[in-house]
Amino acid sequence: MSDMHSLLIAAILGVVEGLTEFLPVSSTGHMIIVGHLLGFEGDTAKTFEVVIQLGSILAVVVMFWRRLFGLIGIHFGRPLQREGESKGRLTLIHILLGMIPAVVLGLVFHDTIKSLFNPINVMYALVVGGLLLIAAECLKPKEPRASGLDDMTYRQAFMIGCFQCLALWPGFSRSGATISGGMLMGVSRYAASEFSFLLAVPMMMGATVLDLYKSWSFLTAADIPMFAVGFVTAFVVALIAIKTFLQLIKRISFIPFAIYRFVVAAAVYVVFF
């Protein structure tokens, strides 16, 4: 593979990762399809995917840095307010409660979960995750009990964490599981989305560091330019995607995302079967 070709592949996959990581459409499903079509598979490809996820995580940190520091008691002047945010009553305990279920299951069944990374499992997860999005829109309370992040209860945070366990199924979508769970628990669509992004930082960081540690032997000096391009591309695209997504969900439901998931599932079937 030539240097220019590998850098082009890195940029393409960085765009795919950045666009899909925080949308309820399954970044895993997209990365499997695009990686297969580009002929970029194997141990190096898996390590590459782990590295560029860090770029997506950094985008969330940049977007929500004030809120993230506020969770640990560090405040920088007067907080900037956005719709869905308020005065700092969301605490680190909410985040920890949202993490516990998936962390426990993820650590206990890490190797088993990794063995599920294949097209057939991803295809089914795309469909089931789409059905959950539709269920969340249809069954959510007419008036949310938590319209903003700071209205959320500990119980709601923990239940969202339980829904997050569904994302251990490759292709399900972590954001899809947590946002759907939040809506079913009476959290507004906007607040559930923001909580999902905040929850992503420790969850994805922990999972990525663990995967990177286990994949370190596949990383060589020659891969650094390619990995750097993918990382930066994923960061920039994820930043744009998050901002756009938070504006979009003020106007539309998640039904279009569910339909899109079904289309991607069909694409997985066509490409691999």
From Swiss-Prot:
Other facts noted in the record for this chain: Bacitracin is thought to be involved in the inhibition of peptidoglycan synthesis by sequestering undecaprenyl diphosphate, thereby reducing the pool of lipid carrier available.
Gene Ontology CC terms: plasma membrane
GO MF annotation list: undecaprenyl-diphosphatase activity
Transmembrane segment boundaries: 6-26, 45-65, 90-110, 116-136, 190-210, 222-242, 252-272
Keyword Hydrolase: yes
Classification via HAMAP family: Undec_diphosphatase (MF_01006)
Name the record gives this protein: Undecaprenyl-diphosphatase
EC id: 3.6.1.27
Family, as annotated: Belongs to the UppP family.
Alphabetical list of Pfam families matching this protein: BacA
Membrane topology classification: Multi-pass membrane protein
Subcellular location: Cell inner membrane
GO biological process, one term: peptidoglycan biosynthetic process
